[in-house]
Amino acid sequence: MEYLWIIPFSPLIAFIIIGLFGYKFLREPLSGIVAVIGVAISAVASIIGFIDVAKTGNYYDLKLYNWISIGDYNVSVSILWDPLSALMTCVVTCVSTFIFIFATGYMKGDESYPRFFAYLSLFVFMMLMLTLSDNLIQLFFGWEGVGLASYLLIGFWHYKKSAANAAMESFVVNRVGDWLFLLGILLAFVTFGTLDYLQIFNKLAGVDYVIITAIALLLFGGAVGKSAQIPLHIWLPNAMEGPTPVSALIHAATMVAAGVYMVARLMPVFASSEVALDTVMFVGTMSAFIAATMGLVQNDIKRIIAYSTLSQLGYMFAAEGLGLFSEGMFHLTSHAVFKALLFLGSGSVLIALHHLLDVQKMGQIGRAMPITTGTFLIGSLALAGIPPFVGFFSKDPIIEGAYEINTFVFLFLWGGAFLTAFYIFRLFFLTFFDGDRLDPHLREHVHESPPNMTIPLIVLATATVVLGFFKEFFINFLKPSLDPAYMKFLPNDVKALVSEGLSRAHHVHIEPNAFSFLGHSLTSFLGILILATAIAGITLAYVMYQIRRIDPVKIGDMFQPIYKLFYNRWYFDHIYYAIFVYGYYKLSKILWFVGDKVIIDGIVDGSGKGSVFAGGVLGKTQLGRISGYVLQMLIGVVIFLSLFLFLK
């Protein structure tokens, strides 16, 4: 398995080549070709390694070189290759390859074309360092690296004030989560004396419950920021200011899923604390539902999909909190495919409509863009959870599991499923079919995207149709990494501890076979209920936005307080502005007045005024009379004698 080093370093080499020679020798399209080759090589190596693990069930911990020495403890740049990291690596590299190909068409003519592909390659390298790490230090390096690359790519068009502000917001909000994450790493090192995953797992049974809970919650704080969960979610919708391939790669398929992956990677730690699992479950649940309500009333095509990403990440975290780690990771895999498809489809629409974002100004472009329309429909059906598309096989099991484990979680995830189906088909009908709102000049020039943009759409759409039927394979494939009974690297006492933590899901039976699950969903009450909910959401969107039997404006007026709540994103931004921006400004003004004007200026100005006053008083004693001078000398002698006698 020595070839595995190629996986992370191939994109790094592409980044270095483009960074050094891009503007001089590798201008469009050569820099794009170099980037595609770099990530494609990683994808091929990932698939080969994936097949090897699937055949043997083994895991490999490769130490590439010693990186940091802290006393007797050494941190290595490493590659942990097991089913979990192999799956995540394949997701990152394969989806990235098609996004890179799409980007060669999307970014055509951009004056900063080489810089864009250099940043993309840097991001993939950092994401792979995060994914392949066997220790928390390398994980943190990749964690911060993807944050840096995300900042650079969100603000890629930095001459736009909105893009620059969005990049800064993303960077600052993520620092809050990263601060918690770093505290968790430090506490883990103090507790275990190591940051290697396998060594941490081996020592779990001997650590106090409160300490494990604190470590897990601090690490999860980092995941909340990186994966844009409530309350650190506000940066993700504004991150859509970056080019659309960035949204597809970073804010759908890879970086925002890093938090979900981290929780799965450290599953034994989280499973050792019921409080930590409950926190993950409830944060994910509320994020899934609240983000879905926000997506209902947005009109920006990319922001609608962004809110759906935030919501689906909530489903993944809810699954992990429920103890359904394999189902959560399978949903991560399927979501990466169909959400990348939806973002790239929106990018195809934006190119055709000269970057018009408002879906209320679109419509009737379906016939002019048949490939984009058809593939976008497939992605929408997958997101809504309609069989036989992959979203049905990955999302519905989470809702069914919640039904058996926690009623509160089930109700919110079930409600979120209805809202998801509604808002994605609201977007679909408004964009491709409904009405005649499109500007006539734009309508004349609408055409299908070129092959380097449509071929990735077709490939991702095909994967969206096919992938769900491999559900059983993926669930079984992940067992050596996520099922304590199959985790060879865990000692028996830790296996017992982890199994007890996951006991909440022991009584849950979810059909692993895709065809059996489909049959179950079409015959059981719960399966029919969940499927009918998705169909109801699609039907309502059709009635309101296609045939217009219900007026959306009247509905908004009837429920205006709720509409305003959703439209203003539950006022999270307003509250944060009032506290952290306006509040900080007012506090600064108070501190300025008290500290600068009253104290500092008071001392400086007061000493000057005091000197003037004292000089005036003393000046009155200088009258030029001998009697006055004698009196002053007498007073001086008295003071001197008094001090002498006192000190003696």
Task: Identify what each model region corresponds to.
Residues M1-N476, E500-D551, K564-W570, H574, ...:
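...captures the hydrophobic TM-helix bundle architecture rather than a specific catalytic motif
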Residues V446, K488-V494, V498:
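Acidic, turn-prone loop/beta-hairpin segments
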Residues F477-N492:
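Membrane-proximal cytoplasmic C-terminal regulatory module of class A 7TM GPCRs
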Residues G556-F566:
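Short, highly charged, low-complexity non-transmembrane loops/tails of multi-pass membrane proteins
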Residues F580:
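Glycine-rich and polybasic anion-binding loops at the starts of cofactor/ligand-binding domains
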Residues D596:
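Alpha-helical polar/charged "hotspots" used for coordination or helix-helix interfaces
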